[in-house]
């Protein structure tokens, strides 16, 4: 009830302002015409004039009405520079705080709907820098005064903090505008405020928060590095050390070598990472073989005769290895060495922010110092903690290529655990090659990150190829019944059993966060390595890119992030670049393929972005 009453008062005030055309009194022309009369009245009744002016200013700012600039100029014209600044400073801060409270208690839903995108950014700033963030917003004139008041009311900032910071932060800008008001007789238009002297004042106002940020950043850096100050090298062996030779690591090293930086790339296992050895390349090779088999069975769709494909499963799996070997030279040690990258095969560990120790695969150890590090350690399949899973055995999207490559025949009964892109691609492909595939997904639909109709289309496509798709089914445990492997699942309170020959775990991938020193350095992680918008970790000279950094687990995004990580690591002293995810291509290679660029409908709705569906 109180919120309704408060909102009614606010709306009544706004209605009265426009209904009675009160805005005509808030024009430069009216102010100049009335200046002499106001001055005479002020000389006769100073307290009444100051009080009335103060209340008008507070009301206008509290209701977020247009005209604050004119009222501020009037303060300078009537009261002079110092008294005008004092009066306007308190009136504007009190009015802003009232608008802040109105937004917090009465306008939350409407303001969020109108300024949702700005609110997201401001919330991030408030969470990270709190009062200092508001202070910088108050200092920069290009940020609308009323927008800050309304949006800050939706944050968790305390009212007393908002008032105090606004009072201090707006003081310099108030002084500039009040000073302009004292020269009102010489100003013919609002553009006249931007005289060279005043323009210089605004330039200083704009530069001040940047300088302040630099100072704060330097203080924060010093604090972060304090425990390591005694071991910071005077000189460095490398400009950049890259940990991991997947897409993110290879691109980072390539960029560093291109600009003639001293760069070392460390890889413990296979060059090319997940994409070449376990992900993109082998899965697409499998999909191609499966799709061709499907087209042969349905050749009549192309005006040909339907044909049952005959093939050796071992030959299909061997072809996948052949495709990998054909691409390997592009990601090889030899190629990158030729580009100027030092490639070390072994396990890297961060000893301190500038020192990396490498346990070489040949048994040796090498320790290098570096100005910057890019962590591109990738991700690994997540295996759910199902009772009995280890006993019955399973494969993942990493291990199935080698395991299935040993089979002469395709496993007849396959269970694919997981309804994401990887699970769907594998389920359809093996079904097209002759396996009886059951796909189990705990969520209400497969490919849950796509729009609902897309998920339904994907399900229909998989079922048309013979995949038994079970959504809203939860895997409980694995058992052996009379020697047969069985997965026990639950649906609608009832338990079901599915016999299988092979089980593929495809429930997602988790970032590699242990084994290379993150925990020893205290670098925060939360499913991925915590990074800022420049891909910096807790230590500004240590960056992360690819699956280990998130938020996407795509090869092309890893390469995309690698550019930002490498360039910022090498040239961040002069210029930093924020990672841009505004246009991310996204494809799942079931048949028909599911692809998009940027947000889909459900993501847009979650972000409060209006969409048009055609």
Which residues are covered by each model-predicted region?
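Membrane-interfacial helix-loop-helix
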Residues: 13-53, 89, 93-149, 154-155, ...
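FAD-site-proximal beta/loop scaffold in flavoenzymes
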Residues: 390-408, 497-575
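Glycine-rich dinucleotide-binding loop and its adjacent helix/turn
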Residues: 280, 377-436, 440, 465, ...
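Glycine-rich flavin
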Residues: 255-261, 266-410, 443-447, 453-454, ...
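Hydrophobic alpha-helical membrane segments of integral membrane proteins
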Residues: 5-8, 47-90, 123-184, 216-219
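Mid-to-C-terminal Rossmann-like scaffold of FAD/NAD(P)H-dependent oxidoreductases
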Residues: 230-240, 245-250, 258, 451-453, ...
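N-terminal Rossmann-like FAD-binding beta1-loop-alpha1 element of flavoenzymes
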Residues: 238-265, 423-432
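A Rossmann-like FAD-binding core segment of flavoenzymes
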Residues: 306-307, 342-345, 349-363, 368, ...
């Amino acid at each position: 009830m109180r919120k309704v009453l408060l909102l009614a008062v606010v709306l009544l005030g706004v209605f009265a302002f426009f209904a009675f055309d009160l805005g005509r009194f808030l024009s430069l022309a009216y102010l100049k015409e009335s200046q002499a009369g106001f001055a005479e009245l002020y000389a006769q009744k100073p307290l009444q004039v100051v009080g009335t002016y103060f209340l008008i200013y507070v009301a206008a700012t509290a209701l977020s009405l247009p005209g604050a600039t004119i009222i501020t100029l009037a303060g300078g014209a009537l009261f002079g520079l110092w008294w005008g600044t004092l009066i306007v400073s308190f009136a504007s801060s009190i009015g802003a705080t009232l608008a802040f409270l109105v937004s917090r208690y009465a306008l939350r839903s409407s303001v969020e709907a109108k300024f949702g995108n700005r609110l997201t950014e401001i919330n991030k700033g408030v969470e990270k820098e709190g009062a200092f963030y508001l202070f910088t917003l108050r200092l920069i004139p290009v940020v609308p005064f009323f927008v800050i008041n309304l949006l800050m009311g939706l944050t968790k900032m305390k009212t007393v903090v908002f008032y105090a910071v606004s009072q201090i932060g707006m003081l310099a800008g108030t002084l500039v505008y009040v000073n302009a008001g004292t020269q009102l007789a010489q100003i013919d238009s609002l553009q006249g405020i931007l005289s060279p002297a005043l323009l210089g004042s605004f330039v200083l106002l704009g530069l001040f928060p940047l300088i302040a940020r630099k100072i704060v950043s330097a203080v924060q850096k010093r604090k972060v590095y304090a425990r390591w100050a005694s071991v910071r090298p005077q000189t460095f062996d490398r400009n950049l050390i890259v940990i991991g030779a997947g897409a993110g690591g290879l691109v980072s090293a390539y960029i560093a070598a291109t600009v003639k930086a001293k760069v070392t790339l460390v890889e413990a296992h296979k060059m090319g990472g997940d994409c070449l050895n376990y992900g993109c390349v082998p899965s697409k090779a499998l999909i191609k073989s499966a799709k061709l088999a499907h087209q042969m069975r349905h050749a009549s769709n192309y005006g040909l005769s339907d044909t049952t494909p005959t093939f050796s499963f071992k030959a299909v799996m061997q072809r996948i290895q052949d495709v990998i070997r054909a691409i390997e030279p592009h990601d090889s040690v030899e190629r990158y060495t030729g580009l100027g990258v030092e490639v070390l095969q072994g396990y890297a560990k961060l000893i301190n922010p500038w020192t990396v120790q490498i346990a070489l695969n040949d048994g040796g150890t090498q320790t290098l110092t570096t100005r910057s590090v890019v962590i591109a350690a990738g991700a690994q399949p997540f295996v759910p903690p199902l009772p009995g899973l280890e006993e019955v055995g399973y494969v993942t999207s990493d291990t199935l290529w080698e395991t299935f490559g040993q089979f002469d025949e395709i496993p007849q009964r396959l269970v694919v655990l997981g309804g994401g892109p990887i699970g769907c691609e594998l389920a359809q492909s093996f079904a097209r090659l002759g396996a009886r595939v059951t796909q189990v997904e705990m969520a209400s639909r497969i490919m849950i990150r796509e729009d609902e109709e897309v998920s339904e289309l994907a399900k229909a496509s998989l079922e048309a190829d013979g995949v038994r798709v079970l959504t809203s089914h939860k895997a409980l445990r694995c058992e052996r019944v009379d020697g047969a492997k069985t997965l026990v699942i639950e649906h609608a309170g009832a338990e079901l059993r599915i016999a299988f020959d092979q089980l593929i775990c495809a429930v997602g991938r988790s970032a590699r966060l242990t084994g290379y020193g993150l925990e020893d350095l205290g670098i925060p992680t939360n499913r991925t390595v915590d990074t800022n918008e420049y891909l910096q970790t807790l230590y500004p000279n240590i960056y992360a890119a690819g699956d280990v950094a998130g938020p996407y687990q795509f090869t092309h995004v890893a390469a995309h992030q690698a550019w930002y990580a490498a360039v910022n690591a090498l040239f961040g002293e002069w210029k930093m670049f924020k990672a841009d995810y505004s246009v991310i291509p996204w494809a799942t290679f079931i048949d028909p393929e599911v692809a998009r660029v940027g947000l889909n409908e459900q993501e847009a709705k979650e972000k409060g972005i209006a969409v048009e569906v055609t």
